[in-house]
Amino acid sequence: MREITPRKIIEMKGKEKIAMVTAYDYPSALLADKAGMDIVFVGDSLGMVVYGEPNTLNVSMEQMVFHTRAVAKAVKRALVLADMPFGSYEVSVEEGVKNAMRLIRAGADAVKIEGGYDHKKLVKKLVRMGIPVMGHTGLTPQRYLRLGGYRLMGETEEEIEEILRDAKALEKAGAFAVVLEFVLADVAKLVTEEVSIPTIGIGAGPHVDGQVLVWHDLLGIYENVPPFVKKYADLASIIQLALENYRGEVKEGRFPAKEHYWEFLDKDDFERKKMKALERLEDE
């Protein structure tokens, strides 16, 4: 069992901020775990940042299982959280249970489900089975068509009510935490005060119990990022420069240099072995 558990995350509420980041493969998960992240999240955002999809709707269970397995192999300390992709739980509770079990078998410690009130039965069922669940309300990317695109949530009474209803339903169903995405900070603060489970914000201000960002966004892999993202590095420029330097040295014959390859120390020995090898080939 990994050091960080759902129980540990719950105990951090109001005491210690929760640091969560996405990771989609072995090396990124290894680095995230070494950095001391509390939660390493295999998000369906991989559809956009890894596979180049315009949204998350085309991400499959097979992709989520594949990437979860890679991440789980790398993480020793942090809690590994895996997203339930669009279409994997909406049809029925039974379908949701089956797919959640696939992610747990792949190495996840918990699953995340977008939505709250509408999926309370599934959350309750999973928790009873021993599968920890994190909810997600506010902007829910899997439902961006209904929301009219990616936009700030919580500006109307109805939206505030819906966000609160989702969070409270998740709490009652047994979820151990809830993501609040692209929600006005005042609303996120209200939700955080109204529920006993941790709130993890992404574009939801500072008055939450933790924060989550996408790996590629915070590391500056892509030029365009959501407005709520802080770039902690500009890896795109570093990687681009390294690749250009490599190409240049190959074209100019400067790579590999002497320290990057090996030769026979005894050239006469090489000549003897070369001649014997050539003779054997001629005899075939």
Swiss-Prot record:
Neither activated nor inhibited by coenzyme A. It is found in: Cytoplasm. GO terms for cellular component: cytoplasm. InterPro entries: Pantoate_hydroxy_MeTrfase (IPR003700), Pyrv/PenolPyrv_kinase-like_dom (IPR015813), Pyrv_kinase-like_dom_sf (IPR040442). The keyword Cytoplasm applies. It is an enzyme of class 2 (transferase). The active site is at E181 (proton acceptor). Binds 1 Mg(2+) ion per subunit. 3-methyl-2-oxobutanoate binds at D44, S45, D83, K112. Mg(2+) binds at D44, D83, E114. Pfam families: Pantoate_transf. One of its GO terms (biological process) is pantothenate biosynthetic process. Its cofactor is Mg(2+). It catalyses: 3-methyl-2-oxobutanoate + (6R)-5,10-methylene-5,6,7,8-tetrahydrofolate + H2O = 2-dehydropantoate + (6S)-5,6,7,8-tetrahydrofolate. Keywords: Coenzyme A biosynthesis, Cytoplasm, Magnesium, Metal-binding, Transferase. Pathway: Cofactor biosynthesis; coenzyme A biosynthesis. Its EC number is 2.1.2.11. NCBIfam families: panB, PRK00311.1. Catalyzes the reversible reaction in which hydroxymethyl group from 5,10-methylenetetrahydrofolate is transferred onto alpha-ketoisovalerate to form ketopantoate. PANTHER family: 3-METHYL-2-OXOBUTANOATE HYDROXYMETHYLTRANSFERASE. Homodecamer; pentamer of dimers. Belongs to the PanB family. This is 3-methyl-2-oxobutanoate hydroxymethyltransferase. It comes from Thermococcus kodakarensis (strain ATCC BAA-918 / JCM 12380 / KOD1).
